[in-house]
Amino acid sequence: MRSLHFLSLWLLVPVALCAAPPFDHGPFDQVLQEYVDDQGLVRYAALAKDRAQLDSYVDSLGLYSPESHPDCFPTREHELAYWINAYNAFTLRGVIDAYPIASVKDAFVLSGFFNRQTFVAGGREMTLDHIENKIIRPTYQEPRIHFAVNCAALSCPQLDNRAFTAPDLDAHLERVLTRFAQDPNHVRLQENRLYLSKILDWYGEDFSAWFPTDRPNPEDMPTIVNYLRPYLLPDLAARLTEDIAIEYNEYDWALNEDKETGSPRPAADSP
């Protein structure tokens, strides 16, 4: 009788079910298409006024995750797409919660937007730093995620205006890496000096660890330049020699905002 009593109590507890796997990122895709332009700039003012769809998607992230409902994420690609989209959606949510701000660092000044402010994924509170450095990087060991997750800053690889999905995840990651490598905001050769995004310095070990073992020239060293080389514009790749000096750009934490003024994105990070 006692076991039946506990069973009936358990049945009364609302349980989040994945009725139609896999997890649907369509609502987030619609948000991105509506509020993010082709340069990765976000219409935060408009999004803050019309946030219902983003909030609904963030609520669904709070119910489901690869950790809480693995059946909703049948492959590694489904899992990784979830975590990339979750990171980007949580970042947007955090910014509009604090909007208007000039920098993402203004959103949680006292203790840190990335390592103290928490969001809920699959019923578990976690920070953006935890998602990136405790889940994505060690679990999936995929360096291209650094060009997919967005920190809401001008110097960050731009926020893509399409959500990541399992079926085309690899192709999507290739696209964002290629876009990054061919963007003078992040990779620029000036005289005999190569100016690179600070992200390539902060996460250098991720790229060198994944330098392809089947590379055409086995003597190529696992350097940042050689990792980027296949994705660079041919003219730039041909000009990179061994005596090129590398310098990392200062990071611009200004908000990646489209203020609807018609102003273009800055030409490049300041070296």
Regions found by a protein language model. Give the residues of each.
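N-terminal secretory signal peptides that target proteins for export/translocation
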Residues: 1-2
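Interaction/scaffold regions that mediate signaling and macromolecular assembly across diverse proteins
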Residues: 21-271
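Bacterial N-terminal signal peptides
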Residues: 5-16
